[in-house]
Amino acid sequence: MTKAPWVGARPPKPGGGLSSAFTSGRGRSFEDFYRAELPGLVVLARALAPPGLAEDVAQEAMMVAYRRWLTIRELAHPEAYVRRACTNLAVSQFRRHLSEARAFRRSGAPQTVEKLGGPDEFWHLVRTLPRRQRQVVALHYVFDLSVADVARTLEISEGSVKVHLSRARQTLARSMGLAVEVES
């Protein structure tokens, strides 16, 4: 996710960092728009997005507006545009969160993951796996693809998919303090 140049720092002074394309037109600069609308977007995102993601969703909505500011600033209600973008992004995050939760339930290890503190910690462990293992785990468990479908998607052999799944399961089991079952 890309962020505005001043995210995490003070925004530039009026006219001090944005090109004239972003400070002219209808008398409102993007900086003024950002300052006025961001707090409301965060509140909106908190109502719609999974916990802990509201600020990211609001920032991403502002990035959408920033990239299209030349067009958006000419709208009668640019704030409606950015609120809709925020709503769409929050719903997407919520759906992603639900997909992870469903995959977690299908994995057959909810009691084990609950010992870790919940699905967030489990998916944090998944993110520590090597890239190919992460891909295979996500496609197989989140998208519920068969081994053959995962192989076609990643353009690797079915045997490679099985090896990556097996290694990922073993690594995750060790990380969670479970007995590692060797698959034959």
Which role fits each region the language model picked out?
Residues V136-H140:
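A short pre-motif secondary-structure segment
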Residues T2-P14, S19-V43:
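A short, charge-rich alpha-helical start-of-domain segment used by transcription regulators
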Residues L41, A45, A54-A65, A85, ...:
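Short, small-hydrophobic-rich alpha-helical interface motif
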Residues L70-R73, A85-R106, K115:
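Arg/Lys-rich amphipathic alpha helix in sigma70-family domain 2
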Residues E121-L129:
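Short amphipathic alpha-helical boundary/capping segments
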Residues T87, V91, L154-L178:
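DNA-recognition helix of helix-turn-helix
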Residues T23-D32, V42-E60, W69-A76:
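Short, charged helix-capping/linker segments at alpha-helix termini
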Residues P51, M62-H77, S92, R96-L98, ...:
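Sigma70-family region 2
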